[in-house]
C-alpha cells in the first residue's frame, strides 16, 4: 500500500507557495503521493501542475475536482497538461460534489447524478487515452473530438464513488475510486467489493482504492478528536457523507479519524491495507503544536 498526503481537506492553506512547499516537503520526507482537494480556493489541477515542475518523484492527484462546472473535454485537456508538466505523475480524481453546491450555488441540475457521471466518463476516458471521441447522450454530445498532449500518456482517472450506482460506474469505466468520510467497516463491506465486482464484470483489472482518513499522531487522542470534530463538522452534514457515516455506525467525522500513538496508527493503516485499500490518503489535522510534522514523518516511515 502507498502512503499519500491530502492537501486542503482539513482547512484552508495560506498561499500557493505554501501548498507547493508542502508537496516538496512530502517528497523529501519520502511520502508516495500528494492529493489536493478542489474546494473554494486554488484550482487543484493547476496547482499540481506547478508542483510537478519542482518535484521529481512524488505522485500527484486531485481529491477531487467537481465535474459539473467543466465540460469533460476541458477537464481532460487541463489534466493531460498537468500530467505532461509532472512527467506522467498525475492522476485525475473527479467527483459529483454535492447538491448544495451544484444546484444551490452554481445553478446546475443535480438530477440523476450517476447518469451524469456515466456520460461524463464516456466522453472523458477516450480523450485521456488519446482516442477520438464520438458520443451522444442526454447531457453530452461530442463528435470527432480528440486531444494530443505529448508527455501525458498513461494518466489514470479515479472517481469519488460512495453509493451503489456510482461505484458501478466507477468500476466499469474508471481506474478506481477516491473516498472520504468512509470508515474501515464500510470500506471492507461495501466500497471495495462493489467496486471490484463492477470492474470485474466490465473486464477491467483490479481498481485503485484511495482511502482518505483524518489522522494525527498524538498522546492525547480524546482532545485531538474534539479538535477534529470542530474542523470537519461540515462534512457530516452532507448527505452522501452522512450516509457513509451512518453505515459505519458512527456519529461524525471525528469517529473515523485515526488518532493515537505509533502502534495504533500503524495497526489501523495495516488493517486498511489488508482489506484492499491501495493508497492511504492522510488528511493530517494540525490540532496541536508539531502535530503535522511528526505525523508526516511517521507516515513516511511506512511509505514505499
Task: Go through each PLM region and give its residues.
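Active-site-adjacent structural elements that line small-molecule/cofactor binding pockets in enzymes
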Residues: 1-304
Amino acid at each position: 500500500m502507498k502512503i499519500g498526503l491530502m492537501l486542503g481537506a482539513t482547512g484552508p492553506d495560506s498561499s500557493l507557495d505554501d501548498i507547493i512547499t508542502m508537496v516538496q516537503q512530502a517528497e523529501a520526507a519520502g511520502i508516495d503521493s500528494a492529493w489536493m482537494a478542489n474546494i473554494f480556493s486554488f484550482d487543484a489541477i493547476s496547482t499540481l501542475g506547478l508542483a510537478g515542475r519542482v518535484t521529481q518523484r512524488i505522485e500527484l492527484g486531485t481529491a477531487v475536482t467537481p465535474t459539473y462546472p467543466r465540460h469533460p473535454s476541458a477537464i481532460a485537456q487541463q489534466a493531460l497538461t498537468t500530467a505532461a508538466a509532472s512527467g506522467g505523475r498525475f492522476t485525475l480524481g473527479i467527483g459529483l460534489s454535492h447538491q448544495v453546491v451544484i444546484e444551490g450555488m452554481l445553478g446546475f441540475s443535480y438530477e440523476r447524478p450517476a447518469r451524469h457521471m456515466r456520460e461524463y466518463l464516456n466522453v472523458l476516458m477516450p480523450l485521456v487515452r488519446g482516442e477520438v471521441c464520438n458520443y451522444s447522450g442526454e447531457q453530452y454530445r461530442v463528435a470527432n473530438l480528440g486531444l494530443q498532449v505529448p508527455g501525458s500518456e498513461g494518466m489514470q482517472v479515479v472517481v469519488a464513488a460512495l453509493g451503489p450506482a456510482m461505484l458501478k460506474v466507477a468500476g466499469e469505466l474508471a481506474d478506481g475510486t477516491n473516498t472520504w468520510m468512509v470508515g474501515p467497516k464500510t470500506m471492507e463491506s461495501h466500497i471495495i467489493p462493489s467496486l471490484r465486482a463492477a470492474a470485474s464484470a466490465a473486464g477491467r483489472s483490479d481498481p485503485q482504492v484511495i482511502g482518505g482518513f483524518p489522522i494525527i499522531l498524538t498522546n492525547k487522542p480524546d482532545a485531538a478528536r474534539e479538535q477534529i470534530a470542530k474542523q470537519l463538522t461540515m462534512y457530516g452534514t452532507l448527505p452522501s457523507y452522512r450516509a457513509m457515516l451512518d453505515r459505519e455506525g458512527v456519529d461524525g467525522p471525528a469517529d473515523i479519524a485515526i488518532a493515537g500513538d505509533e502502534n495504533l496508527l500503524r495497526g489501523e493503516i495495516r488493517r486498511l491495507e489488508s482489506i484492499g485499500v491501495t493508497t492511504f490518503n492522510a488528511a493530517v489535522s494540525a490540532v496541536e503544536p508539531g502535530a503535522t510534522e511528526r505525523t508526516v514523518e511517521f507516515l513516511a516511515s511506512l511509505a514505499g
